[in-house]
Every structure is written in C-alpha cells, then in structure tokens.
C-alpha cells in the first residue's frame, strides 16, 4: 500500500512502547527501541517514545462580560502508564490557549486587571485538563488527578467571582449610559431580527419616558418583546401587537405616580388612548345621518338579499371552526358539527333580519349624542355597562341596558325599539318576551336616566367590545376601558378573546352557560378590570 520510504522509521512501534509484541510482518515503525530518538511529550522532557506536540503561540487574550470560549489541544495518543508520574503539569508554559471574545466597552476593559484574568484563565484550564483525564485508564486517572489537586486549590471558586463581577459591572454600566437592549436571536421567530430590535428599542424608550431606569426599561422591554414574539405566529401579528403595546404605554402613568394611587387613579391608567380606540373601530367624532340608498337588505343570518323580510330563513347560528379530520383540515359549524357546504342551515326562522354597520345609516335611525360635561347632583367616576340588542325593521336596536358600579346594579331597564320587532335574538340577548320591550322606556328617557346616575364626559365606561354597545346607545365617548383591548389577542387586531374565555382564564368562573345575561357580562367585565389593576400593582 505504501512505498518503502521509511517515513515512520524514527517513531517507535506503538506495540513495543506498551510492552506488547508487534504482529505485523512489515511494520512501518521502528523496532530499535534502545537506539530510537527520544521524543518528549508536551508535558515532560523525560518520557520516551511520545510524539512531540507543536506548541502554538498563545494569542493575546482579553476579558469582557460576554461569552468565554477556551480551546485546548487534546492529545489523542494514550500516555504510557510508567510516564504519568513524570508529567509536569505546568499549565501556563505547555498548553496553547485561545480566548475567542466579543467586542466590549472600553470601560470594562480598563477596569479588569491582568492578575484576575490570569486566575480566571487558570481555573478553566485546570477544569479542561481534569476533563481530559477521563480518557485514561482508571488507575492513571487517579494518579493524574492527585497531581491536579494543588493547582486547582490555589484558585478557589473563580467562576462565581467572574459571574458576580460581570453582573456588578453591567449594573454600573447600565446606570451610567443608555444601552439599547437587543433581543436574543431566534431563527424561528415570526419577525426578522432587525424588526425585533427596532420594536425593542421603541418599547425601551416608552418605559424610559415613564420614569424607569435604564436597567428597568431594558428588562421590561425585553420581557414584553419576548412575550409578544412567543405568542405571535406571523410578522403582521407581531408588528400590530407591538404597536398596541407601545400605544398603551404612552397613556400609562409615570412610575412615581403608581405608588399610593387611589382606585380611581389606577383605573385612569387603563383608559385607552384615542389612537387605540380608532385602531379598534371606535367612533369618537360627530356622525352626520345618511339614509340608505338601496332598499335591498342583506340577511345577517343566511346572507340572502331581500326587500320583504318574510322568510323562511335557514341558517347556522354557530361559527365555523377549522379542525383536522383524516389528515385533512376542514371547517365545521360549532352549532351542529356539519361540514361547511354540506347543509344550508340547522335553524329555520320566519323572517330575514339585517343590521346597519355604516355609522351614518345608524344615525339616520337615531342621532348620536355626547354625555354632558358635568351633572348638578352626584358624579359617577366609573361604571360597567352591557347592552342587549334585537332585530327590528330598522336593523339592530337596543333592547336592554344594564349599568353596574362596584359590582352592584344601579340601572337595569328594557328599551322600547322604534321599529317593528322581527326577532328577539334570544340565544344572545336572553330576552324571551316581546312584551318586556313594548313596556320599556324610550332612548330619550334612557339618556335622562343615565345623566341622573351621574354619568358625564369624565366617567370611565367599562365593558367588553364596548364599541358595539356605544353604537347601540348612540353615544360618543372617549374615556373607555375595554377588556377586549385590555387583554389583547395573541394575533392582534382585529382578533379578540371572548368575555367567556377571559373570565374563565383570569377569574376562574364560567359565564354564559345557557344564554347571555347583561348583568352577568357587566359584572364580569368590571371584575376583569379590577384584576388587571391588582396585577399591575404586583408587577410594580
């Protein structure tokens, strides 16, 4: 296989070195054990037959508060048993060490002295060499470890000192300069790393504006960004969730204002900004009434366009839910479990129904109005409300209003609709008898009652999906706490969690077991807001 060039004749045969007989007929190595050249291993000058390892010049090493990487050459040739006792474990002179370090700030480089770095380096060298001895036979390992005891004992517990020095130095550095936090790189994140760094920077600046220190702002920004990154599953959702969080921080109270604040002041910190309300579809401006140009309406249940509301109307009242069946993703209805397209509906009603979504059309049925600036009697600082609606010839109209303050009902009335009732929408409104609506109060009488309660422009209105309730009441109000916005969905706008889900998750209670109840929904929304204020207190 090889030509007889004698390239290995100066190396003693491995079998002879270990005291065994060479079985090879034409061995490439030298069998002249006495006259062969004595080659020293890297640890000693008196070990026979050991190949010499090239000693590389150690590169200048530096220390910082980043990762510490130590590369030590590992000898693959087994050391003869009789040579272990003659080994000289001089770590500094005989082992080539390379420290691959990242860039660091000049302040950290100047503060670290040479002696401390050498001690830290010696600790890692000793540990690395101690790890290599596991490749030797058992009795050799014991002998070699005994030689390490003195070397290791002179540098006790330097790793803990290193970690302590890094944390102390980073704290002092964060207090003295603005260091923008950088999120940890993740190849599986929904957004690119540059976008993540930009959003983390904006979150960091938002916390800085609230009076938090550099270290606190950095920690909170990284924590918020990490939570959003873990819950989002696309770049668009990640971006919208970050923007929503930044908007909420803009109207949050200063750090020094949180301590010792009253319950009303704590609620004040949760009031949504106008930008956030517009993002989620709230109306905060005047609305001019416009009559619908087309008499044809689209059924809100079956999608049929009609001029005469008389049915029949066949539809599915449940929502479409995507699930896997037989390895295939299909959409089924939650009401009956039927696959999409297999049935036109599982419920048959006598009339088609519709609702206006365009605000000018809503204003043509009843105009929008504002709450008064102040009331002559009592002032209502905050309250929770919930509305129930029914279908009429004018679309969806307000049927019931419930107002709750301090978890007790202060107003619960039925509202008489202007149009003819087509459907009570009992499954979602909880109203079973149309006579209750016929004997109810009008919209104008409702405005008088809520003013008598003390509602004004400064009152904080609390609810879930409150933009629909305000549109049903034809109210324009900017001081709102919406639990759908307070507990934002992981996918961002326009997705939102249901009140039933939030109540079960955060309060541990189950609501809406049969039909919707406006009193139950209003109390649940108020309890969720109180839960949020307590949660914010524990975080601060």
Swiss-Prot record:
Pfam family, one: RNase_T
Enzyme class: hydrolase
Swiss-Prot/TrEMBL GO biological process terms: exonucleolytic trimming to generate mature 3'-end of 5.8S rRNA from tricistronic rRNA transcript (SSU-rRNA, 5.8S rRNA, LSU-rRNA); rRNA 3'-end processing; U5 snRNA 3'-end processing
Subcellular location(s) of the protein: Cytoplasm; Nucleus
GO annotation, cellular component aspect: cytoplasm; nucleus
Disulfide bonds, paired cysteine numbers: none
One GO molecular-function entry: nucleic acid binding
Every Exonuclease domain range: 382-529
Zinc finger (C3H1-type): 7-34
Role played: 3' to 5' exoribonuclease required for proper 3' end maturation of MRP RNA and of the U5L snRNA.
Protein name from the UniProt record: RNA exonuclease 3
Organism: Schizosaccharomyces pombe (strain 972 / ATCC 24843) (Fission yeast)
Gene this chain is encoded by: rex3
């Amino acid at each position: 296989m090889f030509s007889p060039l004698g390239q290995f004749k100066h190396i003693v045969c491995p079998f002879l070195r270990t005291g065994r007989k060479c079985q090879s007929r034409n061995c490439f190595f030298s069998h002249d054990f006495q006259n062969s050249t004595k080659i020293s291993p890297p640890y000693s000058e008196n070990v026979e037959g050991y190949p010499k390892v090239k000693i590389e010049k150690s590169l200048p090493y530096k220390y910082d508060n980043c990762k510490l990487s130590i590369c030590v050459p590992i000898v693959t040739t087994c050391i003869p048993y009789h040579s272990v006792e003659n080994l000289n474990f001089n770590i500094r002179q005989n082992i080539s060490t390379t420290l691959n370090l990242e860039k660091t700030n000049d302040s950290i480089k100047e503060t670290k002295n040479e002696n401390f770095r050498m001690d830290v380096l010696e600790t890692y060298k000793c540990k690395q060499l101690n790890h290599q001895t596991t490749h030797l036979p058992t009795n050799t390992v014991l002998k070699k470890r005994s030689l390490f005891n003195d070397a290791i004992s002179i540098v006790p517990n330097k790793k803990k000192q290193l970690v302590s020095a890094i944390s102390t130095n980073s704290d002092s550095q964060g207090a003295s300069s603005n260091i923008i936090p950088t999120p940890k790189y993740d190849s599986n994140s929904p957004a690119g790393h540059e976008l993540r760094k930009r959003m983390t920077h904006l979150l960091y600046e938002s916390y800085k504006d609230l009076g938090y220190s550099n270290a606190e702002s950095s920690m909170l920004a990284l924590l918020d960004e990490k939570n959003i990154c873990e819950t989002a599953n696309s770049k668009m959702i990640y971006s919208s969730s970050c923007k929503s969080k930044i908007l909420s921080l803009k109207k949050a109270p200063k750090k020094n204002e949180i301590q010792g604040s009253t319950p009303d002041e704590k609620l004040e910190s949760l009031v949504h900004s106008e930008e956030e309300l517009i993002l989620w579809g709230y109306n905060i401006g005047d609305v001019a009434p416009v009559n619908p140009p087309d008499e044809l309406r689209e059924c809100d249940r079956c999608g049929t366009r009609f001029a005469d509301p008389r049915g029949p109307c066949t539809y599915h009242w449940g929502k479409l839910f995507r699930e896997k069946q037989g390895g295939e993703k299909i959409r089924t209805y939650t009401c009956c479990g039927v696959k999409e397209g297999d049935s036109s509906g599982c419920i048959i009603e006598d009339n088609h129904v519709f609702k206006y979504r365009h605000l000018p059309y809503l204003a043509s049925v009843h105009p929008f109005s504002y709450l008064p600036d102040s009331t002559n009697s009592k002032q209502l600082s905050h309250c929770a409300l919930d509305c129930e609606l029914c279908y009429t010839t004018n679309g969806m109209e307000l049927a019931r209003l419930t107002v709750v303050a301090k978890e007790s009902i202060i107003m619960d009335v039925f509202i008489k609709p202007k149009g003819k009732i087509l459907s009570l929408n009992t499954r979602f409104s909880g109203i079973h008898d149309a006579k209750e609506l016929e004997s109810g109060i009008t919209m104008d009488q409702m405005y008088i009652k809520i003013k008598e309660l003390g509602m004004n422009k400064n009152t904080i209105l609390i609810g879930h999906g409150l933009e629909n309730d305000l549109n049903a009441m034809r109210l324009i109000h900017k001081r709102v706490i919406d639990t759908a916005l307070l507990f934002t969905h992981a996918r961002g706008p326009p997705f939102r969690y249901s009140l039933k889900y939030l109540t079960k998750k955060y309060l541990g209670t189950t609501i809406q077991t049969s039909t919707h109840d406006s009193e139950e929904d209003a109390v649940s929304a108020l309890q969720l807001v109180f839960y949020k204020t307590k949660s914010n207190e524990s975080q601060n």
